[in-house]
Amino acid sequence: MAETNAKRFIKCYNMIDNALRIQGDMRRSISYTEAVRRAARTNGLVKKYEDQLIDYGRLRNAIVHSSNDEFIIAEPHLEVVEDYEKIANLICTPPLAINTICNKNFKSLTAEVKLKEVMEFMFKTGISSIPIYKDDMLIGVAHANKITKILGKMIYEKKDLEKYISETNIEDVLKILMEDNYYTIAEQSITLDRVLSLFEENRKLLLIVITKTGSLLEHPIGIVSVGDIMDINKILDNYA
C-alpha cells in the first residue's frame, strides 16, 4: 500500500530535523524552526530554502495533532510533498563535487619545470589550471589567467619576456602569486553547496583542488573552478 501524502511529508520533516541537529550538534530541546535558522548561518542549502523549511515546519504542525505523528488531521498537496522531498534529499544526502561537477582531466607538474614548458602544456592540452608539487607537497596552482597578468606586466615594463619564460621555474612564478589567495584545497567529501559557499566567501577564489583528505601532501583527485558555478546551480536545482 502506497504511503499517504501526509506520511511522506512527516518522513521528510523528521529526516531534515534529525539531519540538522546532527550536522549542527544541536540539542533536542531546540525547536525545528530554530534549528533551521541556526543551520542557515553555515549551510548554503538550508539558507537557500530557509523560508520554505520554516513554512513546511508550520504545515507539519497543521497535519498532525501535537507531537503524535500517527494522528493525522490533514493531507498536504502532492506538489508540496514532492518539493519537501527534494529539499530533504539535498540536505540529508547532498551531492558531492567529486561525483558530479569535479574535473578529473588534469595533470600535475613539478616545481622545477620551466614556465615555458607549463605554457606550452596549457596550449597543447587546453588545461588552464595545473597543480604544482615539490617533494610530494602541493606548493601552488599554475593558472593561465594569473600567468597572463604576470607576463602582461613584464611587457608593460619592457622586460625580456623570452628570457624570463625560458629560464624561470614555475615555483618562482608561484612565489609572486602567494598572497593572491586564488585557490584552496578541500577533501573528497566536500558537497556542492559547500563549494558554492567557498566561492561566495572568497570572491578572489578561482579554483578548489580536491584531495582525499584535503591535505597538501596528497595528489589531487579533482578540480572545481569558478566557471563551474552555473552548472553546480543547475545540478542542485534538478537534484532529486
Predicted features and spans:
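Tandem CBS (Bateman) regulatory domains
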Residues: 85-105, 143-205, 225-240
